[in-house]
Amino acid sequence: MPEIRVTPLGAGQDVGRSCILVSIAGKNVMLDCGMHMGFSDDRRFPDFSYNTRSGRLTDFLDCVIISHFHLDHCGALPYFSEMVGYDGPIYMTQPTQAICPILLEDYRKIAVDKKGEANFFTSQMIKDCMKKVVAVHLHQTVQVDDELEIKAYYAGHVLGAAMFQIKVGSESVVYTGDYNMTPDRHLGAAWIDKCRPSLLITESTYATTIRDSKRCRERDFLKKVHETVERGGKVLIPVFALGRAQELCILLETFWERMDLKAPIYFSTGLTEKANHYYKLFIPWTNQKIRKTFVQRNMFEFKHIKAFDRAFADSPGPMVVFATPGMLHAGQSLQIFRKWAGNEKNMVIMPGYCVQGTVGHKILSGQRKLEMEGRQVLEVKMQVEYMSFSAHADAKGIMQLVGQAEPENVLLVHGEAKKMEFLKQKIEQEFRVNCYMPANGETVTLPTSPSIPVGISLGLLKREMAQGLLPDAKKPRLLHGTLIMKDSNFRLVSSEQALKELGLAEHQLRFTCRVHLHDTRKEQEMAMRVYSHLKSVLKDHCVQHLPDGSVTVESILVQAAAHSEDPGTKVLLVSWTYQDEELGSYLTSLLKKGLPQAS
């Protein structure tokens, strides 16, 4: 019997180094390839030896999918492809493809150039790894091979984050990566259709948390920042380069403007420029408000937030600094923290989750004496605050997604064991489905439904044979038709036969696009010009000028009409059926360029 097997190589009852191996109907897919920020030894990367037991890695794995650019999801990718030896396709969205190498290089500089770590990937390895990447658009079905297909859904969380559906035949797995079910100031909420997968693999970072009102949290954050700078203190906000950083920058920028505050706000050098560039480049990935107002005002060009210089950390007086990385495990945020930790007037606000082993996790757990590098002890006197601006779904959001997707089974990853256990019970009780939470290296095996026999009508087979394509046992062919179930038996018939048998009338769905052209001529004359232009350009298509003045190209209909407000403008209505969608799009773009001048 066919089955689905899932083995977490990372993020099994743990947060960090997300890496999940999925086998579905004989296809092997690796979901994410992250590093653990709390370790600097072999435990940093997932245990890839599991993949190499079956021989050559590229022969074993059909593809790798990266959900988003955070290093706990993509940080081990160059190591895996260039040092372990994976040479197959790597799928991710375009924003992830653009931002991922920048964050990998930033981390490499910290690990190798500053800390002197060995057995780490090089700059060239990052470049070589990214050459293997295939970019995926949202809702685009990508055919990895003849049987395996993948599809991306919007996940919120960070710019470019996606949930992925992996499908082989009738079996499918949905992997959420990290996602957020509530929209924020710069991104929309995650969304997936009622795809009813065989298995939903979901993150469970906040498995037992139901967040309070976002407005209350924002008010509390602004109050604490304001009080600290008013008493002359400094505020450190450790963030990752893109994501919560932009969310909190927009919040503080608006507050500073409203309150007319003078204390300087700084952001790690270079990162604001990079962030601004990528948000401009990938504006369709942001939320509706930002997309609407972007032409008039770029929300990411901040008036009160300036680039940070290392020397500013020693300057007297109040200030607010956004510094990377977000867990205080290295880099500029850790350097500033060490300088400011001894002054009780100062404050550090941790806006997101910190994995075990990081300085961020230690101070949030109440440690006030920290052993740093070289056995130095750092006494923390500054105030420590945790305010969850994390872009992960809370327990309510996870339950909402499960209800939305309607899976047959659920598997939890990217969370802590005790919290996962609580959520597991909730899911099983509410949705009456099996829920699993394997540890790293543990395999969950799910039997899947056997194949269903389908009878094919003789008429449909004859039509296929008439196309001159001979059957090939080694290469399956797709048959397009309408599936009818009667007395628990399935038959595949032509759409014409289905309509006849079921006594239904055919309905046709048409898409219409308006094209505005400046032209003072009458509609009939305009239609004639359109006909002449299309006839000369589309020589391989049947272009007709009908008696009513409209023009047809295959199933596409073009009609000229007067503009209701501007007599000097004509409106071309271009409509087509989904079968001619490609030609319809081409025709629309062609007409938008205008008509050639009459000789």
Curated annotation (Swiss-Prot):
<keyword id="KW-0378">Hydrolase</keyword>
<feature type="short sequence motif" description="HXHXDH motif">
    <location>
        <begin position="68"/>
        <end position="73"/>
    </location>
</feature>
<dbReference type="GO" id="GO:0005737">
    <property type="term" value="C:cytoplasm"/>
</dbReference>
<feature type="binding site">
    <location>
        <position position="68"/>
    </location>
    <ligand>
        <name>Zn(2+) 1</name>
    </ligand>
</feature>
<keyword id="KW-0862">Zinc</keyword>
<keyword id="KW-0963">Cytoplasm</keyword>
<dbReference type="Pfam" id="PF21386">
    <property type="entry name" value="IntS11_C"/>
</dbReference>
<feature type="short sequence motif" description="Nuclear localization signal">
    <location>
        <begin position="469"/>
        <end position="479"/>
    </location>
</feature>
<dbReference type="InterPro" id="IPR001279">
    <property type="entry name" value="Metallo-B-lactamas"/>
</dbReference>
<dbReference type="InterPro" id="IPR036866">
    <property type="entry name" value="RibonucZ/Hydroxyglut_hydro"/>
</dbReference>
<comment type="subunit">
    <text>Component of the Integrator complex, composed of core subunits INTS1, INTS2, INTS3, INTS4, INTS5, INTS6, INTS7, INTS8, INTS9/RC74, INTS10, INTS11/CPSF3L, INTS12, INTS13, INTS14 and INTS15. The core complex associates with protein phosphatase 2A subunits PPP2CA and PPP2R1A, to form the Integrator-PP2A (INTAC) complex. INTS11 is part of the RNA endonuclease subcomplex, composed of INTS4, INTS9, INTS11 and inositol hexakisphosphate (InsP6). Interacts with WDR73; interaction is required for the assembly of the RNA endonuclease subcomplex in the cytoplasm.</text>
</comment>
<dbReference type="Pfam" id="PF10996">
    <property type="entry name" value="Beta-Casp"/>
</dbReference>
<dbReference type="Pfam" id="PF07521">
    <property type="entry name" value="RMMBL"/>
</dbReference>
<feature type="binding site">
    <location>
        <position position="72"/>
    </location>
    <ligand>
        <name>Zn(2+) 2</name>
    </ligand>
</feature>
<dbReference type="GO" id="GO:0160240">
    <property type="term" value="P:RNA polymerase II transcription initiation surveillance"/>
</dbReference>
<feature type="binding site">
    <location>
        <position position="178"/>
    </location>
    <ligand>
        <name>Zn(2+) 1</name>
    </ligand>
</feature>
<feature type="cross-link" description="Glycyl lysine isopeptide (Lys-Gly) (interchain with G-Cter in SUMO)">
    <location>
        <position position="381"/>
    </location>
</feature>
<feature type="cross-link" description="Glycyl lysine isopeptide (Lys-Gly) (interchain with G-Cter in SUMO)">
    <location>
        <position position="462"/>
    </location>
</feature>
<feature type="binding site">
    <location>
        <position position="157"/>
    </location>
    <ligand>
        <name>Zn(2+) 1</name>
    </ligand>
</feature>
<dbReference type="GO" id="GO:0160232">
    <property type="term" value="C:INTAC complex"/>
</dbReference>
<keyword id="KW-0539">Nucleus</keyword>
<protein>
    <recommendedName>
        <fullName>Integrator complex subunit 11</fullName>
        <ecNumber>3.1.27.-</ecNumber>
    </recommendedName>
</protein>
<feature type="active site">
    <location>
        <position position="203"/>
    </location>
</feature>
<dbReference type="InterPro" id="IPR050698">
    <property type="entry name" value="MBL"/>
</dbReference>
<dbReference type="GO" id="GO:0004521">
    <property type="term" value="F:RNA endonuclease activity"/>
</dbReference>
<feature type="cross-link" description="Glycyl lysine isopeptide (Lys-Gly) (interchain with G-Cter in SUMO)">
    <location>
        <position position="475"/>
    </location>
</feature>
<dbReference type="InterPro" id="IPR048662">
    <property type="entry name" value="IntS11_C"/>
</dbReference>
<keyword id="KW-1017">Isopeptide bond</keyword>
<keyword id="KW-0832">Ubl conjugation</keyword>
<dbReference type="Pfam" id="PF16661">
    <property type="entry name" value="Lactamase_B_6"/>
</dbReference>
<dbReference type="InterPro" id="IPR041897">
    <property type="entry name" value="INTS11-like_MBL-fold"/>
</dbReference>
<feature type="binding site">
    <location>
        <position position="414"/>
    </location>
    <ligand>
        <name>Zn(2+) 2</name>
    </ligand>
</feature>
<dbReference type="GO" id="GO:0032039">
    <property type="term" value="C:integrator complex"/>
</dbReference>
<keyword id="KW-0479">Metal-binding</keyword>
<dbReference type="GO" id="GO:0016180">
    <property type="term" value="P:snRNA processing"/>
</dbReference>
<comment type="similarity">
    <text>Belongs to the metallo-beta-lactamase superfamily. RNA-metabolizing metallo-beta-lactamase-like family. INTS11 subfamily.</text>
</comment>
<dbReference type="GO" id="GO:0005634">
    <property type="term" value="C:nucleus"/>
</dbReference>
<dbReference type="InterPro" id="IPR022712">
    <property type="entry name" value="Beta_Casp"/>
</dbReference>
<dbReference type="GO" id="GO:0034472">
    <property type="term" value="P:snRNA 3'-end processing"/>
</dbReference>
<dbReference type="InterPro" id="IPR011108">
    <property type="entry name" value="RMMBL"/>
</dbReference>
<feature type="binding site">
    <location>
        <position position="73"/>
    </location>
    <ligand>
        <name>Zn(2+) 2</name>
    </ligand>
</feature>
<comment type="function">
    <text>RNA endonuclease component of the integrator complex, a multiprotein complex that terminates RNA polymerase II (Pol II) transcription in the promoter-proximal region of genes.</text>
</comment>
